[in-house]
Amino acid sequence: VVHERGRSLIVPVAEVRRLSAAGNYVEVHASAARPYLVRATLSRLAQRLDPAEFLRVHRSHLVRAGFIAEVAPWAHGDVRLTLRDGSALMLSRRYRGLLPEGWLQCQAER
């Protein structure tokens, strides 16, 4: 449930593509044209989502695994993730180690 402008909107988890920290809020990027702002922490929302479906790729980003279109090596051991909407995020070294074993190699071979 997302609260916006005095209304409560139900955003199905199946529509959520990624979540990004934005100060004291989280931007929920779904199939809507613009992200919804939720007053919560990214960690709190991550606890409520299926970890097999949503991956923590950076301290500021959580991404639906199926929304990742491309995985490419980047500078200093980081990895660049290109999403299906054309946006790009960095998979930091810190969070790369938390991914399921073999996931990164499997994605790179797709």
Task: For each feature predicted by the language model, list its residue ranges.
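Conserved binding/recognition cores within well-folded domains
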Residues: 1-90, 107-110
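C-terminal output/interaction extensions
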Residues: 94-110
